[in-house]
């Protein structure tokens, strides 16, 4: 079974820097496991590796789609599988790096994602329309009635995951939680999780947002705002919709920046919750442990030789 190393963790923890360093030392190449970094038109808000960083180690699934393209988790899995095969053919180690837990899980494990077809799109649209009319709580209540086990694992505000579960239930006629139980590994994988003191992570998130504002964050958000009538996944990304009230003249820029920091901190918390509950992870602290990288390398070597 093909070996795949995965590096996961909350936003701003330092996944990119560590992954590049590990790839250089372990003869690896990087596959992005982030649902938003595939889009070409946005750089700052998606926290992609810079062009200089990408020049150090080859990256896959970065800048390979337009924000106007339809892109699902199945598309990601199909493309990532091809990337892993390509890396492996070179005799190198595929290193999956990302913060989108469901995407990472769907790639590393066999999951019944199904084909994207007109029926699926129609079912998904049904729940999107319901959400707009009734709100996240009522949407979640429907899932709770259909599949309490699945609902218990999905926070009420996380409408995207709720809609995904309802869509799968509609498409297959089976409970989402029962299908999750049938998961089996697609690869021989090792997942390295990065985490640290919560307040330090929050401080780094706030600092990152401030830096993003100096790199063109507002211009990217304006581009998304100007195209918001088109239905595309990037509208769900934290970093863009927080600025819409500013463009509408409803809030100050300062208030929107504060809202982005708050949303990013909440997202980091949700990321950690998913990783802890859904994936078998070896945890390390890159911010407080000076020997963190070497410990990870030792763990990877042990896994590679096992």
Swiss-Prot record:
Q: Which GO terms describe its biological process?
A: tRNA modification
Positions bearing the site annotation: Interaction with substrate tRNA: 100
Q: Where is this region: Interaction with substrate tRNA?
A: 34-37
Q: Which GO terms describe its molecular function?
A: ATP binding; tRNA dimethylallyltransferase activity
Keywords recorded for this protein, A-Z:
ATP-binding, Magnesium, Nucleotide-binding, Transferase, tRNA processing
Residue ranges the record marks as coiled coil: none
Stated family: Belongs to the IPP transferase family.
Q: What SUPFAM superfamilies is this protein classified in?
A: P-loop containing nucleoside triphosphate hydrolases (SSF52540)
* Entry EC no(s): 2.5.1.75
Which superkingdom does the taxonomy of this entry point to? Answer: Bacteria
Residues engaged in binding substrate: 11-16
Q: How would you summarize the oligomeric state and partners of this protein?
A: Monomer.
Q: Which Gene3D superfamilies match?
A: 1.10.20.140, P-loop containing nucleotide triphosphate hydrolases
Task: Tell me which InterPro entries the record gives.
Answer: Dimethylallyltransferase, IPT, P-loop_NTPase
Residues binding ATP are: 9-16
Name of protein? tRNA dimethylallyltransferase
Which reaction is recorded as catalysed by this protein?
adenosine(37) in tRNA + dimethylallyl diphosphate = N(6)-dimethylallyladenosine(37) in tRNA + diphosphate
Protein function: Catalyzes the transfer of a dimethylallyl group onto the adenine at position 37 in tRNAs that read codons beginning with uridine, leading to the formation of N6-(dimethylallyl)adenosine (i(6)A).
**Keyword Magnesium recorded:** yes
**Cofactor(s) recorded in Swiss-Prot or TrEMBL:** Mg(2+)
Question: What does the record give as the organism's lineage?
Answer: Bacteria, Bacillati, Bacillota, Bacilli, Lactobacillales
């Amino acid at each position: 079974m093909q070996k795949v190393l995965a590096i996961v963790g909350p936003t701003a923890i330092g996944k990119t820097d560590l992954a590049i360093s590990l790839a250089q030392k372990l003869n690896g190449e990087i596959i992005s496991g982030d649902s938003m970094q595939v889009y070409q038109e946005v750089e700052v808000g998606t926290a992609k590796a810079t062009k200089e960083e990408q020049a150090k180690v080859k990256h896959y699934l970065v800048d390979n789609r337009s924000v106007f393209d339809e892109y699902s988790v199945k598309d990601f899995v199909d493309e990532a599988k091809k990337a892993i095969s390509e890396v492996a053919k070179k005799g190198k180690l595929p290193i999956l790096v990302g913060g989108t837990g469901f995407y990472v899980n769907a790639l590393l494990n066999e999951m019944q994602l199904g084909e994207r077809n007109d029926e699926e799109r129609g079912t998904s649209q049904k729940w999107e329309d319901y959400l707009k009319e009734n709100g996240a709580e009522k949407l979640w209540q429907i899932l709770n009635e259909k599949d309490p086990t699945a609902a218990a694992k999905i926070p009420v505000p996380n409408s995207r995951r709720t809609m995904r579960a309802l869509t799968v239930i509609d498409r297959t006629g089976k409970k989402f939680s029962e299908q999750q139980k049938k998961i089996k590994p697609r690869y021989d994988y090792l997942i390295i999780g990065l985490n640290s003191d919560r307040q330090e992570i929050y401080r780094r998130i706030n600092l990152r947002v401030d830096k993003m504002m100096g790199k063109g964050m507002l211009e990217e958000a304006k581009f998304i705002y100007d195209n918001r009538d088109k239905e595309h996944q990037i509208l769900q990304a934290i970093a863009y919709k927080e600025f819409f009230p500013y463009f509408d003249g409803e809030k100050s820029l300062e208030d929107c920046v504060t809202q982005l920091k708050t949303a990013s901190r909440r997202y980091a918390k949700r990321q950690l919750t998913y990783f802890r509950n859904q994936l078998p992870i070896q945890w390390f602290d890159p911010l407080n442990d000076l020997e963190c990288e070497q410990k990870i390398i030792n763990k990877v070597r042990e896994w590679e030789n096992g």
